[in-house]
Amino acid sequence: QTNWNTDFIVDQPYTSFKFFFTANSADPGAQYPVSGFMKFSDGSNLQVINETMNPPIGTGRMFGPFPAIPGKQASQMNFKVGASNDPGALGFSYRISVQGCR
């Protein structure tokens, strides 16, 4: 089972959110689409990350902090890491996490 599309549960109110990505392996020329969404209890969402990365192995990247949206209750943070179009990039591994900040 891959984790290219991962939801992180938000179980309390936070003032902002940070997304973290670290490549454990990568093909030197491969490009990976990365996107992140704030999902809300009313079913709506807001895209906060939309870019293509060529991550060096062992290098981390923080996205954010993204402020909480007034009047909206965050229910999940969603992180998507897509596949590269480069066939040599198969087997790419990475770590992702999301942090809620008070």
Question: What is each residue range found by the language model?
Answer:
Residues 1-34:
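Short, surface-exposed binding/anchoring microloops in extracellular/periplasmic proteins
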Residues 3-12, 56-71:
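Beta-sandwich interaction modules
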Residues 11-15, 32, 49, 53-54, ...:
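Mature soluble domains of exported/periplasmic/lumenal proteins and thiol-rich metal-chelating peptides
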Residues 16, 41-44, 72-74:
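Short, solvent-exposed coil/turn segments at beta-strand boundaries
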Residues 19, 65-92:
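Noncatalytic modules at the cell exterior or secretory-pathway interfaces
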Residues 29-52:
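Short, surface-exposed beta-strand/strand-loop-strand elements in extracellular ectodomains
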Residues 31, 58-60, 74-76:
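Glycine-centered loop/turn motifs
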Residues 36-38, 44, 82-102:
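Exposed low-complexity, polar/acidic, P/S/T/G-rich flexible segments that act as propeptides
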